[in-house]
Amino acid sequence: MTKRAEAKYKIDRRMGQNIWGRPKSPVNRREYGPGQHGQRRKGKLSDFGVQLRAKQKLKGYYANISERQFHAIYVEATRLKGDSGENLIGLLERRLDAVVYRAKFVSTMFAARQFINHGHIKVNGKRVNIPSYKVRVGDVIEVKEASKQLAFVLEASQLAERDVPDYIEVDHNKMTAKFARIPALSDVPFAVQMEPHLIVEFYSR
């Protein structure tokens, strides 16, 4: 198993949830955390603990975004009009790695980050190799021509375990995707419940 896969599954075990809905997640077989003490019964979390856990889960979902990056996104969310929790989700879903994952060009959020880093993605005809690049409504994302026949790309597009959300318009024959609109929390196909309002409470302490 690769280090990336180990990190991904470690997040699942720590959260005690299959946060991406993956069939091979270890929590499908056991419901305790990683390490030798993972089987110990955990006590009830404090309000702070619940808020921290919500933050760790959302950060982990988006390929373990660094705290610095995540907090910067939160700050931006608070400066936008409307609900800060909803804004936070909208900004996270505008990340290029999130769009590439949602479009089913790759099978995992971690793979999306690597795929972009290696120069396989174009936005509006220009190569972009920054996973955190902020996609705008109307932007067209495409897999570079030379990369369209990569086996793992073709395999990802056929994954039955998740569907492409309706705020992304995808043509898998051409390997292109259009970011149609900024989603609300209820639009995003999370495999588990995400609670951005708890993250707002965490940072507001």
UniProtKB/Swiss-Prot annotation:
<dbReference type="InterPro" id="IPR018079">
    <property type="entry name" value="Ribosomal_uS4_CS"/>
</dbReference>
<comment type="similarity">
    <text>Belongs to the universal ribosomal protein uS4 family.</text>
</comment>
<dbReference type="GO" id="GO:0006412">
    <property type="term" value="P:translation"/>
</dbReference>
<keyword id="KW-0694">RNA-binding</keyword>
<protein>
    <recommendedName>
        <fullName>Small ribosomal subunit protein uS4</fullName>
    </recommendedName>
</protein>
<feature type="region of interest" description="Disordered">
    <location>
        <begin position="19"/>
        <end position="45"/>
    </location>
</feature>
<keyword id="KW-0687">Ribonucleoprotein</keyword>
<keyword id="KW-0689">Ribosomal protein</keyword>
<dbReference type="InterPro" id="IPR036986">
    <property type="entry name" value="S4_RNA-bd_sf"/>
</dbReference>
<dbReference type="InterPro" id="IPR002942">
    <property type="entry name" value="S4_RNA-bd"/>
</dbReference>
<dbReference type="GO" id="GO:0019843">
    <property type="term" value="F:rRNA binding"/>
</dbReference>
<comment type="subunit">
    <text>Part of the 30S ribosomal subunit. Contacts protein S5. The interaction surface between S4 and S5 is involved in control of translational fidelity.</text>
</comment>
<dbReference type="InterPro" id="IPR001912">
    <property type="entry name" value="Ribosomal_uS4_N"/>
</dbReference>
<comment type="function">
    <text>One of the primary rRNA binding proteins, it binds directly to 16S rRNA where it nucleates assembly of the body of the 30S subunit.</text>
</comment>
<comment type="function">
    <text>With S5 and S12 plays an important role in translational accuracy.</text>
</comment>
<dbReference type="GO" id="GO:0003735">
    <property type="term" value="F:structural constituent of ribosome"/>
</dbReference>
<dbReference type="GO" id="GO:0042274">
    <property type="term" value="P:ribosomal small subunit biogenesis"/>
</dbReference>
<keyword id="KW-0699">rRNA-binding</keyword>
<dbReference type="Pfam" id="PF00163">
    <property type="entry name" value="Ribosomal_S4"/>
</dbReference>
<dbReference type="InterPro" id="IPR005709">
    <property type="entry name" value="Ribosomal_uS4_bac-type"/>
</dbReference>
<dbReference type="Pfam" id="PF01479">
    <property type="entry name" value="S4"/>
</dbReference>
<feature type="domain" description="S4 RNA-binding">
    <location>
        <begin position="94"/>
        <end position="157"/>
    </location>
</feature>
<dbReference type="InterPro" id="IPR022801">
    <property type="entry name" value="Ribosomal_uS4"/>
</dbReference>
<dbReference type="GO" id="GO:0015935">
    <property type="term" value="C:small ribosomal subunit"/>
</dbReference>
